[in-house]
Each structure stands twice: as structure tokens, then as C-alpha cells.
Amino acid sequence: MRIDAYSIAFTSQYESAQSSLSRVSQKGEMVHTLSLHNESESLELLARGTVMTQEGVVDLELLASLSRKERYVQESLVHQSAIDPLVINFEGGLAGVDTTNKFSFDLNSDGKKEMISLLGSGNGFLAIDKNNNGIIDDGSEILGKKSGDGFADLALYDDDRNGVIDENDSVFEKLLVWHKSALDEGILTLKHARVGALLLDNVASMFHYKNEGESNATLQKSGVVLFEGGRAGW
């Protein structure tokens, strides 16, 4: 797929409520927290627009939502270091995170593996197999490690500076989708994943994936992916 032009408008609505009693101490990047929390959170995203491709015009309207309610007591010691990998949902929804199961992976590529959350079924990390060994070795091969912003990292590969990653960009054939869930694991090219184009425009979409007070991941930004056949998703 090749994109000639596009116009997209985003609307986001985020609501959260929290009551808590906390005691926090911090030393350097280490944060110790003891807290009693009542939390609720909801996110609604809407994208409307048109995309001009060589095959014709795609009119898109995407609506997605996430919500949660939770009460918990928490004591934690956390090392705060933000890495924002890009995730593609093959079914077109927002990124899905498994808040129960984790796996060992060196996400910040410092030579030490951490326990991070698996993705939900039908979701995958956007990656580049830099050493062509057929596996994703660590976070250095996942978009989002370099700057902490996956969209900013991806924009570096926009050869024609049109705000789209598609077949006109040399990186397109190198990009992979690494899907790793509790049910399956594998690596797909964008073509095999039926991904036609990735739009670099994005919208702030803060949402926390938590389970019994444990923060497993945070959704920070969302953008639009176009699949072959004209279907659009987040």
C-alpha cells in the first residue's frame, strides 16, 4: 500500500477518580510506596478522516474505549524508567496487555532481563531484527527503546517525510510484528500481518493496565494503522 495524502482528526476523552492514603519515599530513581487506593479510569478515543491511496479513498471512523475499577493495598519498590514500545492490534482495537502473565525479557537492553507483561492475544510489538538472527533479542530491536517514544523512533524512518510509514519507505520491508502472548508467539512481516501503512500522527491516550494494584503497563499514545483492503485500526 502507498499513501498519497491523508487527513485525520483525533478526539480523546479521559476520566479518572482516585482516593488514596499513601506514604512515599524516594532515593534516586527508586520509589517506595505504601498505599490504600480506590481507583476508576476510562478512556474513549475517536479518529475520523480520509486516506488517499493508489487504490482509492478510504473513509475511516474508529471508536475505542477502555475502563477499569479497582481497590487495593500496595507496597512497592519501583525503578522508574520509561520505555514506550509500539504495539499493533491485529483486530484493530487498542493495545491489549495480559495483566496476569509475564515473561523474562531485557526490555531496556542493559544486559539484565526483567519480568514484563505479555501482550493480549492478537497483539504484537513493532520491531526490527537488526542482526538478522530470526529472533527479537532485546529492547534495542523494538521501536520505542531509543527515545522512550515509539512514534518518535518510527518517524526517523519516514524517508519522504509525509507522516506515513508505507511501501515508499525503505524500512517498511524490514519492520516486523513480534506477537508474544500466553497462547502463541511468532514474528510476522508487515505484509504477512496485512499491514499496509502506519500513520505517524498520534493522540495522547493515557491508560494504566493494572491488576490488584500492580501496574503492568501504561498506554501513552495511540495512532492509526491501515490494513490491506482498506480496514483501519489503532
What are the language-model segments listed below?
Residues 2-234:
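Calcium-binding acidic motifs and repeat modules
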